[in-house]
Amino acid sequence: MYAYLKGIITKITAKYIVLETNGIGYILHVANPYAYSGQVNQEDQIYVHQVVREDAHLLYGFRSEDEKKLFLSLISVSGIGPVSALAIIAADDNAGLVQAIETKNITYLTKFPKIGKKTAQQMVLDLEGKVVVAGDDLPAKVAVQASAENQELEEAMEAMLALGYKATELKKIKKFFEGTTDTAENYIKSALKMLVK
């Protein structure tokens, strides 16, 4: 079991980042890979959780210990696997998540990909009173400006598909952002907030 890895981020894709430490490149599946865009070729410390399956050994990465604890709480719920837990964390509304669990807001919880009514009810049953989230330390939404071609938006939509959101949902979101320019990270944050509301 690993607590964290410290190394240099060498690659970012829609589903994972690669962290090189001591000459070994580790694939870390993270909630929002593009959140690490500003740290490529820089040293970073990423908290990790290893999942061992019959066909794979996977590492999941987190920006903080609190995010890792939230992930571990989520995967402890029957019906929520690591991919679904990352999608929930990627929504970047941890306070809203805790409030939905505490107030038994099933409608809010079912807006996450692959979370149906029964799983949402199980989340409330298993996590009510047990999930505490420290303050939301991520930056506020950045104003977007017009642009003709938008590679960042394409990368954001690809990452959203990787999180399990449907292409039909993402088409509507993409139209909303067309003609704007921003980072893939901010597009993802904004899109997730729109989808969760």
From Swiss-Prot:
Residues 1-63 are annotated as: Domain I. It is found in: Cytoplasm. CDD domains: UBA_RuvA_C (cd14332). Residues 148-197 are annotated as: Domain III. Keywords: Cytoplasm, DNA damage, DNA recombination, DNA repair, DNA-binding. GO terms for cellular component: cytoplasm; Holliday junction helicase complex; Holliday junction resolvase complex. InterPro entries: DNA_helicase_Holl-junc_RuvA_I, Hlx-hairpin-Hlx_DNA-bd_motif, NA-bd_OB-fold, RuvA, RuvA_2-like, RuvA_C, RuvA_C_sf. Signal peptide: none annotated. GO terms for molecular function: ATP binding; four-way junction DNA binding; four-way junction helicase activity. Residues 143-147 are annotated as: Flexible linker. GO terms for biological process: DNA recombination; DNA repair. Residues 64-142 are annotated as: Domain II. It holds the Pfam family RuvA_C. Has three domains with a flexible linker between the domains II and III and assumes an 'L' shape. Domain III is highly mobile and contacts RuvB. Homotetramer. Forms an RuvA(8)-RuvB(12)-Holliday junction (HJ) complex. HJ DNA is sandwiched between 2 RuvA tetramers; dsDNA enters through RuvA and exits via RuvB. An RuvB hexamer assembles on each DNA strand where it exits the tetramer. Each RuvB hexamer is contacted by two RuvA subunits (via domain III) on 2 adjacent RuvB subunits; this complex drives branch migration. In the full resolvosome a probable DNA-RuvA(4)-RuvB(12)-RuvC(2) complex forms which resolves the HJ. The RuvA-RuvB-RuvC complex processes Holliday junction (HJ) DNA during genetic recombination and DNA repair, while the RuvA-RuvB complex plays an important role in the rescue of blocked DNA replication forks via replication fork reversal (RFR). RuvA specifically binds to HJ cruciform DNA, conferring on it an open structure. The RuvB hexamer acts as an ATP-dependent pump, pulling dsDNA into and through the RuvAB complex. HJ branch migration allows RuvC to scan DNA until it finds its consensus sequence, where it cleaves and resolves the cruciform DNA. Belongs to the RuvA family. This is Holliday junction branch migration complex subunit RuvA.
